[in-house]
């Protein structure tokens, strides 16, 4: 018996098509909420440090995304930033798992600096299947699906292909720790790359959007200690599908729970940066 036309369409779309479409629609809905809230007064709290901020909109958006997905996919698991901050464990099992950052760039959001995003990643059997990132203020929808390419508003993304660090624009983020030892290491790593004649090192306040800039070819590399799995999951798929590389700062394979990453347009670039970095210890997401 041949599959029906509807069945053939579903097979062509892939086994997680419904999940992907749900992620896109929820990212767009969340973006509308964030755009409206950006200009309004906010109730701001701190989490692990004075620089680690959370607002009522973070909670509202996360609750919206999880409640909608849980209703549609009741057997799926969830890892989300604010739930983790409230004590939920970050465990990546073989079950279908949603990895969610409701507002990446909360400090930007608090200050009405318009570089903020919603990030929704999806993994099955501990392998990332797709990522959806929505730049709320510029209305740019970044998507990546394993084996099917990466796109921004329907336009295919490609990394720059740069291999020479002396011709590279490198992006990073500071991370939430502000103690003297951590700041010294952060500034030392930046100094090492500048001594290596990188064109520049930029901090934009949103790791997910920085990684999307890498995927689009607007930057050549990214590194960070202290980012979490919800910052990285969706962007990893997008970068890989745009032809880039995402690895651990040791130079080994990416460990999504290790709170550290080097991403680059080429493996040569990634290894050059990994070799230059001093490690800043942030622990692991699955041990907190």
UniProtKB/Swiss-Prot annotation:
Query: So what does this thing catalyse?
Result: a myo-inositol phosphate + H2O = myo-inositol + phosphate; 1D-myo-inositol 1-phosphate + H2O = myo-inositol + phosphate; 1D-myo-inositol 2-phosphate + H2O = myo-inositol + phosphate; 1D-myo-inositol 3-phosphate + H2O = myo-inositol + phosphate
- Keyword Lyase annotated: no
Q: Which cofactor does it need?
A: Mg(2+)
Q: Name the PROSITE patterns for this protein.
A: IMP_1, IMP_2
Enzyme Commission numbers on file: 3.1.3.25
**CDD domains to which the protein is assigned, alphabetical:** IMPase
Coarsely, its chief localization is cytoplasm
Means of activity regulation: Inhibited by high Li(+) and restricted Mg(2+) concentrations.
Binding-site positions, substrate: 81, 103-106, 205-207, 224, 231
Specify which residues bind Mg(2+) 1 according to the UniProt entry for this protein: 81, 101, 103
GO biological process terms, alphabetically, are:
inositol biosynthetic process; inositol metabolic process; phosphate-containing compound metabolic process; phosphatidylinositol phosphate biosynthetic process; response to lithium ion; signal transduction
Where can this protein be found? Answer: Cytoplasm
The entry lists its GO molecular-function terms as:
glucose-1-phosphatase activity; glycerol-2-phosphatase activity; inositol monophosphate 1-phosphatase activity; inositol monophosphate 3-phosphatase activity; inositol monophosphate 4-phosphatase activity; metal ion binding; protein homodimerization activity
Query: What does the record give as its pathway?
Result: Polyol metabolism; myo-inositol biosynthesis; myo-inositol from D-glucose 6-phosphate: step 2/2
Activity vs pH: Optimum pH is 7.5-8.0.
- Enzyme category, top tier: hydrolase
Q: Does the keyword Membrane apply?
A: no
Q: How does it assemble?
A: Homodimer.
Q: Please report the name of this protein according to its UniProt entry.
A: Inositol monophosphatase 2
